[in-house]
A protein has these predicted regions:
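Short beta-strand-loop/turn "lid" adjacent to the catalytic site in phosphate-handling enzymes
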Residues: 62-95, 116-118, 148-171, 196, ...
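Short glycine/proline- and charge-enriched loop/turn segments
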Residues: 32-36, 160-163, 439
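Short loop/turn motifs at secondary-structure junctions
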Residues: 66, 188-191, 361, 378
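Active-site core segments that coordinate phosphate-bearing ligands/cofactors
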Residues: 4-5, 102, 106-157, 168-179, ...
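Active-site donor-binding loop signature of nucleotide-sugar glycosyltransferases
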Residues: 30-32, 197, 270, 447
Length: 480
């Protein structure tokens, strides 16, 4: 049995076939149009998202000869409001990166309601407030809801709990919409889709050739975790534009909806029947974006960043702190800014590249340290995926700094693999135990440094991070 995986990321839509052994074949990709009409605003075209998802899926289906089931994974918290009568969006899709509702969040916090601008809650209200006519026909959609609606040709209006739990609009156990929050935001409960499990038959995807059954809806980070065979335990870090860690906790719901002292959140990563699986989540705001920026300056080629870093034996005293848009976990200082330290006339692009990759690796270890402070268990092996996972120098440096084996996913985009495997579990063809055996590891990087050397480097790193904090005091004083 084979699954079609549809993966809507922040800048592209991907599709592929995933088989019961976890092999990913017949991949197709199309770029999304991302607009930023004003500083801090990030929009996508809802119609384009649906059209491209179906188009790339059809390309995969034509090449592969068809599939049995479909799994969908997507960037979380990106928000759409649409007219249920026509299936058309009433405005742009507001990306999870969109910050236009920052002031709304601060105003609501003063009234006792804590919401963050990267959640869906205030984005929904912003979109609804810009509708002047009758609103009873409006419906809210995260991207899983939007794709399920279009793949089923309007028959399915649902959302899964891994997507719902990052909207800011559900109860702590992610079992139902929080009517108190909806009331506070003056949002009609009829706008919101029924909450469903991540894995399980939902209905035919009639917009696709053969009408395969839609059997999984899952947020991107949960799909990445699942795609790397982290089922009942395990920790992964996805190093993409930013970096996101997830470390499985178990089935006990969180005690709070808010940011923990460690700078992590607790989020749902899978739900089946009465059981929801939870994980700690930590975020680095700038990771691969730093490598891309360095290349755009003409100082090094993105694809050759590993070779450039390895062309010199040391950083020659140069240190880089990646904080283009602030520091996430554990600091959450939006006013921090990125910086190079220790520059001299002898500093070359190779020294800077090496320092840059070192800095991103350090930030990854900051995430692991946060899990430890929260009482979580990282384990002896950390799994990694995402664009930076193909950089062997970076992966080795991450292993050296964290003192653990680092298992690199054979699939750079483990989200695609995870959504397909989730669909095969949803239809009953695979069990969770089966998936746990499908590690899909390309290679393992083993740490080379002593405990004393790691400790010394980590102490020096923390000192440099502190020097970047509070660069823009007004932003550093903001918290959500």
């Amino acid at each position: 049995m084979r699954a079609l995986s549809i993966d809507v990321g922040s800048s592209s839509v991907r599709s592929a076939v995933v088989d019961e052994a976890g092999a990913v074949t017949f991949p197709h990709r199309a770029p999304l149009t991302v607009r930023s009409p004003h500083p801090g605003e990030v929009e996508l075209d809802p119609g384009e998202i649906a059209e491209l998802a179906i188009a790339v899926a059809e390309s995969t289906l034509r090449e592969s000869g068809g599939v049995d089931v479909v799994g969908v994974t997507n960037q979380r918290a990106t928000t759409i409001v649409f007219d249920v009568r026509t299936g058309r969006a009433i405005g742009p899709a507001l990306s999870w990166q969109d910050l236009r509702t920052v002031l709304d969040c601060l105003t609501l916090r003063a009234r006792g309601l804590r919401l963050a601008p990267n959640q869906s809650a205030t984005k929904v209200r912003w979109l609804v407030e810009h509708v002047t006519e009758e609103r009873s026909h409006l419906r809210f959609a995260t991207l899983d809801t939007w794709l399920a609606w279009h793949l089923s040709r309007g028959e399915l209006f649902v959302t899964d709990r891994t997507n719902a739990c990052v909207t800011g609009l559900v109860t702590r156990d992610a079992r139902r919409w929080n009517v108190d929050v909806l009331d506070a935001l003056e949002l009609d409960p009829s706008m919101f889709a029924p909450l469903v499990d991540s894995a399980g038959p939902l209905g035919p995807a009639r917009a696709l050739s053969g009408s395969p059954t839609l059997c999984a809806l899952v947020g991107d980070q949960a799909a990445s975790l699942f795609g790397q065979a982290c089922v009942e335990r395990g920790t992964k870090v996805t190093f993409g534009t930013g970096a996101i860690l997830n470390s499985i906790l178990g089935s006990t719901p969180p005690e709070t909806d808010y940011l923990l002292e460690s700078g992590c959140y607790v989020t749902a990563v899978r739900s089946q029947g009465a059981v929801t699986t939870w994980a700690l989540e930590g975020i680095v705001l700038s990771a691969g974006a730093c490598v891309q920026w360095f290349g755009e300056l003409g100082l090094g080629d993105v694809s050759g960043s590993s070779a450039l870093a390895e062309s010199v034996p040391t950083r020659d005293g140069v240190v880089f702190v990646p904080a283009f848009s602030g520091l996430g976990t554990p600091h959450w200082d939006f006013g921090a800014r990125g910086a190079f330290f220790g520059l001299t006339r002898g500093s070359s692009p190779a020294h800077l590249q090496r320092a840059l990759l070192d800095g991103v690796a350090h930030r990854g270890v900051d995430l692991l340290d946060a899990v430890g402070r929260e009482g979580g268990t990282v384990g002896d092996v950390v799994r990694v995926d995402g664009g930076m996972s193909v950089n062997r120098f970076f992966v080795q440096r991450f292993a050296d700094l964290c003192g653990r084996d680092v298992a690199v996913s054979a699939e750079v985009e483990a989200t695609t693999r995870g959504a397909g495997l989730m669909a095969l579990v949803g239809v009953g063809h695979l069990t969770l135990a089966d998936v746990a055996k499908l590690s899909g590891v390309a290679y393992v990087a083993t740490p080379r440094w002593s405990l004393d050397e790691r400790a010394q480097r980590r102490d020096q790193w923390r000192q440099h991070v502190e020097r970047t904090r509070g660069t823009i005091p007004e932003l550093s004083s903001v918290s959500f």
